[in-house]
Amino acid sequence: MNKVMTAREAIDLIQDNMTFAFTGFVSFGLPEDLLITLEEKFINEGSPKNLSLFYDAAPGCREAHGGNHLAHRGLIRRIHGGHLDLNRKLAALCSENAMPVFMVPQDVNTHLLRAIAGGEPGIVTKIGLKTYADPRQDGCRANQAAWDCGETEIGRAHV
């Protein structure tokens, strides 16, 4: 397999109901071409759809870039992220409860990406205890749809 591909070739690998993960902080390290290509493919072909979105930080630039390209009903079915303010269009859909949204502390997301890349099953951390991230409190649920889905992104381990 060729290690270099176009944005379209990469997006064509994404199928309906998959998890799409990307990173970037504001516009640094942001795969803008991939996000634009994903948006265009969804608008023109209706696929891929119902993606779970995973990002670690704050990928966007208020109105026009980053996660804002993914703000289309039917494209995203669930969000696990670190910050929504820089993705205003996506945040608006979240406020409308268009999908469950879980806002997990950025450092937890970063460590989780590293663990997944290393073949680990997950991470154990004290980060977020006694805050909204604590599974005994809000469990990172950021909207009513997250409560209504009956799931959470995190759990509590007894050691």
Report each predicted region and the residues it spans.
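Conserved alpha/beta enzyme-core scaffold
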Residues: 1-156
